[in-house]
Amino acid sequence: ERVVPVGRLDYDTSGALIMSNDGEFINLITHPRHKINKTYIAKIGGKLEDRHLKILRSGVRIDNYKTAPAEVNIVKNKNKSSNTLVRLTIHEGKNRQIRRMFEALGYEVLKLKREAIEDLTLEGLKKGEYRVLTIHEVKKLINKANNGEK
C-alpha cells in the first residue's frame, strides 16, 4: 500500500511527521476542525516584542485571513543575541503558516522545527530516524480528533 505524509513540512522546516496509508486517519489528523495541535520551535531574527506576542496569541492577520490564536512562549531571548527562540502550538497548519505569521509581524524565521504532534514528540529519535506508533497512540490521536470537531 502507498504510505503518504500526514500533513506536510516546508522544505526549510524539520521535525515530526507522521506517515500513514489510512485516508480517513490522514483527514482526521490534518483537517483544522479536528484541532490536532502541532508544536514548533522557531528561531526568529530580532527580539519578539510583547505587543507581537499578544497578536500571535489572539490571531495574526495574513492577507484577508486571520489565523486562529496560537499558544506562544518565548524559550530564549538573551540580551546579547539579536534572535529569539519561540515555542508555538497551532492546530490549523495552513501553507507556511508560522513563517507567514512572523513575516506579517516583521520577523524572519531563521529556523523552524516541528517538535510535536499532540503528545507525539521526537524524544529519543535522532534526525532521520523513525518509529512505529503504538495502537494506544493512534487511538489517542483519533479520540482527540473526534473530540476536537465542532
Question: Predicted regions span which residues?
Answer:
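Basic, flexible Lys/Arg- and Gly-enriched helix-loop patches that mediate nucleic-acid binding at interfaces
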Residues: 1-150
